[in-house]
Amino acid sequence: MIAMEGGAGNISTKMALEDTILTPRFYTTDFAAMDRLNVDLVRREWDAVMAELRADHNRKHFVRTPEFEKDLNELPEALRLEFKDFLVSSLTAEFSGCVLYAEIKKRITNPDIRELFSYMSRDEARHAGFINEILKDHGIGVDLGFLTKVKKYTYFKPKFIFYATYLSEKIGYARYITIYRQMERHPERQFHPIFKWFERWCNDEFRHGEAFALLMRADPKLLSGLNKLWIKFFLLAVFATMHVRDHMRPAFYEALGMPVDEYDMRVFRITSEISRQVFPVMLDIDNPRFWAGLNQLRKVSEAIADAKAQGGVMGAIKRAVLPLKAALTFGRLYMLPAKSNELPREIRLQPAW
């Protein structure tokens, strides 16, 4: 452990408070609609998922060991900064889920749904707390109480919460398990002990995603008609955001020994394969135009960052024009043909990747 750095904790909190298209957000929703949810259509599989959550297999997993005391300042500067960004972003995403799930639990009486969100908020609080303790060990902890009070909240209808959080949980599983498997193959690249925790950690994310899959399959209209267009939108938004964000951490992925595009493709494949359990449409991630569009979005995002740094009149003009270019690029990506998927009779999956 190292001494607290003056103001460092505030810097981490400011990072977590950032509201951009690339940063994790806090959400609120229609709690009355949540209270009316009915899972009778998937009762057998629902009870099985709830039994797993009730068992709390990871209740003793998130305990730091002495190896966590290694000074982050021993890392090369670029890697240290990007790893810190990775931790703060991960913490914000986990804590966002914790806040939303806890609020849903507090505001509803439906016993099935209330029990689910009780367990999921428990898990997300545990994840966020574990990351924050690591940050605090190095004098850069995030003030979670302050974050709860001042972070902007975005309202989503329940169906949008389901689409977004299902993808967030499943892509979180895919990201963590991909890094964990890489560390299994190349232990010499494990520059921080947190990666050893990722296998069991990501199983929590997987179980949460299973619950959201069942909530959607319990209401077939969420997966038909015009809602297919919304599903395609959320798939593209989540994949595109991840791709752009990952390219902002080149030193991090170099240290892991995984080129960003290779890592992203692996995560996209796992997430797409898993989402066949619930989504009737899939993105064609093997279409060369899909990757060309993602790379164009990345370049526009980099140009926007450069324009902000440039300042002045020209910088302001670029900041006004470039988001339009990003929107057009996203629109072209959205218009690419998607793949149809026939939903399986059995919904539940096991984390076998």
From Swiss-Prot:
Pathway assignment: Porphyrin-containing compound metabolism; bacteriochlorophyll biosynthesis (light-independent)
Catalytic activity: Mg-protoporphyrin IX 13-monomethyl ester + 3 NADPH + 3 O2 + 2 H(+) = 3,8-divinyl protochlorophyllide a + 3 NADP(+) + 5 H2O
Enzyme class: oxidoreductase
One GO biological process term: light-independent bacteriochlorophyll biosynthetic process
CDD domains: ACSF
Gene Ontology molecular function, alphabetical: iron ion binding; magnesium-protoporphyrin IX monomethyl ester (oxidative) cyclase activity
Entry annotated with the keyword Cytoplasm: no
Cofactor(s) the protein requires to work: Fe cation
InterPro entries xref list: AcsF, Ferritin-like_SF, Rr_diiron-bd_dom
Superkingdom, natural source: Bacteria
Entry keyword annotation includes Iron: yes
Enzyme Commission (EC) number: 1.14.13.81
Keywords from the UniProt entry: Bacteriochlorophyll biosynthesis, Chlorophyll biosynthesis, Iron, Metal-binding, NADP, Oxidoreductase, Photosynthesis
Function description: Catalyzes the formation of the isocyclic ring in chlorophyll biosynthesis. Mediates the cyclase reaction, which results in the formation of divinylprotochlorophyllide (Pchlide) characteristic of all chlorophylls from magnesium-protoporphyrin IX 13-monomethyl ester (MgPMME).
PANTHER family: MAGNESIUM-PROTOPORPHYRIN IX MONOMETHYL ESTER [OXIDATIVE] CYCLASE, CHLOROPLASTIC (PTHR31053:SF2)
Family assignment from sequence similarity: Belongs to the AcsF family.
Name of the protein in its database record: Aerobic magnesium-protoporphyrin IX monomethyl ester [oxidative] cyclase
Taxonomic source organism: Bradyrhizobium sp. (strain BTAi1 / ATCC BAA-1182)
Lineage: Bacteria, Pseudomonadati, Pseudomonadota, Alphaproteobacteria, Hyphomicrobiales
Gene designation: acsF
